[in-house]
C-alpha cells in the first residue's frame, strides 16, 4: 500500500487550495501558519511545491528586518532576530502583551499581570475580541507584521491566494484587516490586484483534509490539471 508523508503546513496549504467540497479552487497558494512557531506551505500549479531538498516553504525564517547600517551582523540561533518567526510567532505577541500590561495599567492585560499570571498570546486574542483597546492594538501590530510577510509572498509568487492560519486566525478581522492593508501598501503597483488575502477556511481540520488530498494528488497525478 502506498504511503505519502509531508509536513503539516504543506498539507494545510493544499487543503486551503480546495473548497469545502474538496474541489480545487486556487492553483497558486501561499499559506502562513502562525502559532507557537511560524510555518509555511506553498501550492503552485495545484500541487505542493517542495523545492530541491523538500524543505521549501520555511517562511518563518525569512528575514523581515536586519540592521544593515554596517557589516551584516553575525547570525545567531534560530529563529534569527529579525526573522518572521522572531517577530510574529506566539512568543512575539507574548512580549507585546507584557509591554502593554506595563504601559496600560487599566487594561485586561494589566490585570493578568497584577494577578501574577503570565500574559500570553491567547489572553491577548481573547481580550481583543472582548473589546479591550490595548489588546486590540497589540493584535493590530501583530497583523501589520504579518502583512509585511504577505507583501514579500506576493512579490515572490504573485499567488491567487495568501492564507493566514494557525492560532493567529482566531483573532479574525482584528488581525486580517491590518495584515491586508499593510500588504497592499507594500507591494508594487499592480501586484496583488488578483491576490486574495484571507484567513484559513478549514481551521483545525486543514491537516487531515490536506493529508487526504495529498494521497489523492499522488495517486492521481492529473488531479490538479
What are these regions (language model features)?
Residues 1-22:
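Active-site neighborhood for divalent-cation/phosphate handling
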Residues 11-18, 40-42, 61-63:
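Adenylate-forming
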Residues 4, 29-33, 39-41:
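Short glycine-aspartate micro-motif
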Residues 55-70:
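A short, polar/charged loop-to-alpha-helix boundary motif
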Residues 8, 35, 211:
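Active-site glycine-centered loops adjacent to acidic/histidine catalytic or metal-binding residues
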Residues 15-30, 66-225:
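ATP-binding/phosphotransfer module of carbohydrate and carboxylate kinases, centering on a glycine-rich
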